[in-house]
Amino acid sequence: GAGPSGLSAAYQLAVRGHEVEIRDAMAEPGGMMRYGIPEYRLPRAVLDAEVARLVELGVVITCNTKIDDLLAEQAEGDFDAVFVAIGAHLSKRVDIPNMDAGHMVDAVTFLRDVASGNRPEIGKRVAIYGAGNTAMDAARVARRLGADDSIIIYRRTQEQMPAHVEEMEGAEREGVKMNWLR
């Protein structure tokens, strides 16, 4: 995989003189840095420059390539070792009553779709359940996609939110509303 750990491992191996190849299922390298972190937080030019540094070191990156049989791939490629960097791109599951009653999507999928150019259809009012940094990103992106109201709903108090205060403040500056436990 060409996400953070795969790219980091490739760099460490390449600077030590090893020949390195990366295979990734996505269209472009970067993993969650490209598909989970909004561009306003991590400009794609910065990420692309880091990937270009790896290529300059001789790292071969092949995208749009899913590995179905790791052992066969290792044998066919005559690799001495394989580092499996499959990523951590899953959202936390929460039990929300009537979750199947309306259009609901997890924040990671929403952010990945936006980053991939697949603009999701959103309504004028968007509710985000949770108050972590990913929730703040999703709320801000919803506003940028045209939502009139983007509301963070959190089951605890503001003091208990896992997001960094500056992330909350940035979201509020963009018009995101916060609904805390009272």
Where are these regions (language model features)?
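Flavin (primarily FAD) binding-site architecture
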Residues: A85-D100, M104-V105
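Short hydrophobic core segments
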Residues: F79-G87, A127-Y129
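Conserved acidic residues
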Residues: D80, G102, K124
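Rossmann-like dinucleotide-binding cores of NAD(P)H-dependent redox enzymes
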Residues: I22, M26-L57, I61, V114, ...
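Glycine-rich, phosphate-binding/catalytic loops in enzymes
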Residues: R16, E39, M99-G102, L145
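Extreme N-terminal leader/targeting segments of oxidoreductases
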Residues: V15, D48-A52, A101-A107
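Rossmann-like dinucleotide/flavin-binding elements
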Residues: A2-R23, T62-Q74, L90-K92, V108-V165
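Conserved N-terminal/central alpha/beta ligand/cofactor-binding core
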Residues: M33-R34, E50-A81, M99
